[in-house]
Amino acid sequence: PEYRPTVIDTAVLARRLVRDEVPNCKLSTLASRLRLDHSPTHRALDDALATTDLLHVLIERASGFGVLGLDDLVTLSKLAGHPQAAKLTMTTLLPRTPGVYMFCGGRDEVLYVGKASNLRQRVRSYFGGEDRRRIATMLREARQVRHFELPDPLTAEIVEGRLIARMLPRYNRAGKRADKYCYVRLDAAAPWPRLAVVKEPSPSGLHLGPLPSRTMAGLVIEAFHSALPLRRCSTRLGAGYQPPPGASPCSSAQLGASQCPCAGLADAAGYARAVDTARRAFQGDPTAIVERLSARMGELACAQRFEEAALARDRLSALLGAVRRDRLLAAVRRAGRCEVRRGEVAWTFDAGRLVDVSVAGTAGRALPADPPPPPADGRPVGRALVDEALCVAKYLDRNAGQLEVVSCSGVWDFPVAADDALPRLV
């Protein structure tokens, strides 16, 4: 294997740690001013010995910034110049293990919650390459860092989501993102069904979601409309609807892109076939729509209409992503209560909720945040539960080949089958 040693640049470290004590950071100047045991003579051995002496001095100085290991020293060149570098002492007691960290303000309020595979390394990184404006403001307010040490990154991600949902920290945008969740709904039982964006699923109708934004839901609907002549108007059409005399068709119908039953210009049999194709996509089989959209995308690309082809690609990507999320959530719910093991860590899930985690040789441990409650009978699934179930489902799907299923009360469907079109189109 290729030899790739860890590199420590003593010149950069010296500029960060002793720049105010010396006129320049030449090795000869540093050796003289810091009274090193060896002086450089432009000969390999003497210069190497002087550099080693300098490194020992810099390591001693670096300890004042909370440097306790090689990884800390490697990143110090970035950290020491940060406006809030003095607060690096808040990271001194953080372990190099998975967990959840919380930046807290002067009144002990939680400002920001995050997860990490290596708590110490992740928290210290905020004082280096992090350039988001809101994080800079948060660091100015932070007075301490609290943490929960957890057995693995999956548990850390789940606990992070629970804490954000419970505390709604000011600097966590993820905590506010759930309010934007929405669904695409098809009321297939209604006369002349149409697609709509709704905030919550209802007992009747078919739904795709939850989707992260109305923009994404709009792209999904556009994907259906690009492939199927479903009506786009919002007119309520009951079983006995009669179009008013002289009603004019909507613009999409005039262009031949959709049927228009509200103006009496629709073929019931053809419309029923389009609804049946849409229903199959909602139930997890978007093959017909994928084929039509991919063919349309190819035609546009061949005609050098690349912007329109890119829009068709985005619509198709949104549709496949929505179907994929739906499949993952359905799979984790079908699994019921199951115990899964990877290495020394074992998790117990109940319909996508993490209810217990243990490490080999130890009893199950209480988590810092309780799981979201299961949905009441007949009520839509809560957003916190959806987030956690989706997190679990993605992990099980991604790592299915490395997991040992100890028990499962339902049906184990991981890895979830992907559409053949997904790898080449998304």
Predicted regions and their residues:
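Residue-level detector of short coil/turn "hinge" positions at structural boundaries
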Residues: 2-3, 38-40, 171, 232
